[in-house]
Amino acid sequence: KLDQPAPSTQETSFIEKMKKTGRNIVVFYGSQTGTGEEFANRLSKDAHRYGMGSMAADPEEYDMSELSRLAEIGNSLAIFCMATYGEGDPTDNAQDFYDWLQETDGQLSGVNYPVFALGDKTYEHYNAMGAYVDKRLEELGAKRVFDLGMGDDDGNLEEDFVTWREQFWPAMCEHFGVEASGEDSSVRQYELKEHNDINMNKVYTGELGRLKSFETQKPPFDAKNPFLAPVTVNRKLNKAGELHKMHLEVDITGSKIRYESGDHVAVYPTNNTVIVNRLGQILGVDLDSVISLNNLDEESNKKHPFPCPTTYRTALTHYLDIIHPPRTNVLYELAQYATDLKDQENTDSMASSAPEGKALYQSFVLEDNRNILAILEDLPSLRPPIDHLCELMPRLQARYYSIASSSKVHPNSIHICAVLVEYXTKGVATTWLKYIRKSQFRLPFKASNPVIMVGPGTGIAPFMGFIQERGWLKESGKEVGETVLYCGCRHKEEDYLYQEELEQAHKKGALTKLNVAFSREQDQKVYVQHLLRKNKVDLWRQIHEDYAHIYICGDARNMARDVQTAFYEIAEELGGMTRTQATDYIKKLMTKGRYSQDVWS
């Protein structure tokens, strides 16, 4: 990065860009998995439908202190689509913006704004980032022109967004004195260019950044430049059960990739070739045609929806998410291509905010988990041009896994515990594109501090790395505190993950105590929280007297809450506290970094 020239003020000024291109609306997004960016693009597209000039913008690419100049543009509006990440934190691309908001005392009078927040109710800090931006902008003198929207990914995020958006635009039309008429027209963002005579060395084959980066792999490896890592071990962990829990080891020799126990590894999946081929067949196209989709807006920072030039086959295999159910905006744009009136009405209805349309989308698309291929197969007259479909589908996102190894013991490989919903070898690639994401999940600086790890099911993954590292420290002659694990599964003989490794670690003393809850082995279900209560005296000593660090990994919806409640109860009973005092006690442990969670819903 050192030899890259610093971007000029012109490039980092969204105000100059808006003035130059005649836009009055800017939609900023904080996005970790692509949804916030997708919603921002949809709002920007909406504005064009109403005849207003708009641009979606990544706050990381611009100087956000320029918000104070927004009033220089007549009828201006800044929309914020802000996702919350982790424990109430901003997304990576919104971190600098968040820091600026906290530190600035600049005046933002004359700035009109609304905020749509993206979050998940199962997490304690639900929509913390969106709520903070909404409140802080007002404190700095900006004017909220529409209520804060709250999107809940644990419920129906798409419906929350559509409902907010349907009320937002009529209010904005009134605010700007604009006629609300353009809603029915489809706006194309990209135009198709077919390359009949092109040097194939200039065609992308799945690379995310630099062309030919797979042939000449150069560090540093990150989201734009992932490492092509061979999978050296791929074995099934559970003996029975519906899900297939796999232990994978990927070779990172020569990559200079460094990782710590508790980090996440991001893996880019590829789509199933059967689905890709069937899409090509249904839409009647040669998937190996070389194409580019070029942005019709020449001033946009985003020249293409994915790396171009490429083939339809590469786009559908490596770049586009064709597996998840499509969002309503995709159906809205595709409805016009249905030649059968009934198919068109149904597709239109599912894209609307009418109660019956929402119910149809919920049952037909979400509950039945229909991807775009299934929808096209079920609506035989719906045959959109493939380039429009490629424009509309969201980008395929990396999947994050907790690393199940310690780099002290395994410096040249990364271990992963992954669940395959459908067990078929085609679901596991022989090479994986990957990079590392740092996490807050860290072993205590002082090895003499006890650690209490709670991780049922695949939540055990990061603790395999922790146990390996504590064992390594012990063998190196360090004083290591108690290492205590609470894990769980349904049946000992079916889905006890890493049984041999755990029993071996316990035998060698790397693991001081191994507590396993088998939930279905007896009449009364037993979960990890029951074992915590059972061992309350030991736990309270470890936490209150020996300064233990607590780590929770796994399901956010039930397990993490139930475990937290168990800790409250232990603090009440053995610490002589009220529930309020016990809650404050655990919150203080969180603030000090002694109670960490890596949870998902």
Swiss-Prot record:
Keywords: Endoplasmic reticulum, FAD, Flavoprotein, FMN, Membrane, NADP, Oxidoreductase. It comes from the Eukaryota. NADP(+) binds at residues 458, 519-520, 525-529, 562. Residues 224-425 form the FAD-binding FR-type domain. Its EC number is 1.6.2.4. Coiled coil: none annotated. Residues 25-169 form the Flavodoxin-like domain. It is found in: Endoplasmic reticulum membrane. It is a single-pass membrane protein. GO terms for molecular function: flavin adenine dinucleotide binding; FMN binding; NADPH-hemoprotein reductase activity. It is an enzyme of class 1 (oxidoreductase). Binds 1 FAD per monomer. Binds 1 FMN per monomer. InterPro entries: CysJ-like_FAD-binding, FAD-bd_FR_type, Flavdoxin-like, Flavodoxin/NO_synth, Flavoprot_Pyr_Nucl_cyt_Rdtase, Flavoprotein-like_sf, FNR_nucleotide-bd, NADPH_Cyt_P450_Rdtase_alpha. FMN binds at residues 31-36, 83-86, 118-127, 153. GO terms for cellular component: cytosol; endoplasmic reticulum membrane. This enzyme is required for electron transfer from NADP to cytochrome P450 in microsomes. It can also provide electron transfer to heme oxygenase and cytochrome B5. Belongs to the NADPH--cytochrome P450 reductase family. In the N-terminal section; belongs to the flavodoxin family. This is NADPH--cytochrome P450 reductase. The lineage of its organism: Eukaryota, Metazoa, Chordata, Craniata, Vertebrata.
